[in-house]
Amino acid sequence: MNYKIYTDGACSGNPGIGGWGVVIVNKNDKKIYLNGGEKFTTNNQMELTAAIKALKYFNTSKKIILHTDSKYLKDGIEQWIKNWKKNGWKTFTKKPVKNKELWVELDNLIKKHFITWIWVKGHDGILYN
């Protein structure tokens, strides 16, 4: 079964109080809503957390189309992470990767799923974003 997942993260102040949200839609249009937050976090941490919580929802391998308005999340998981791992979790400027623990967790979670990552423009009238 294919699932569509919509994730988002936000922060008031950066860092500051933040939250994340997830909508999971199955082929029968049934929706599952997940959300949470942190007292002291960043926008990027909340974006990563939303994706992590969405993928942790599933106990078995799924085909997923994951929509995010975070280029940080999409580019990080599709492009940057390969080099970060090769470089000992350092950026191309030799600085430590920010949010490494979250990236490692996400990287481990994606291994059991078939995921297509879709970037959507934030606050552009897209349902569930």
Description of each model-found segment:
Residues 10-14, 52-129:
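RNase H catalytic domain
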Residues 1-45, 49, 53-62:
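RNase H-like nuclease fold core
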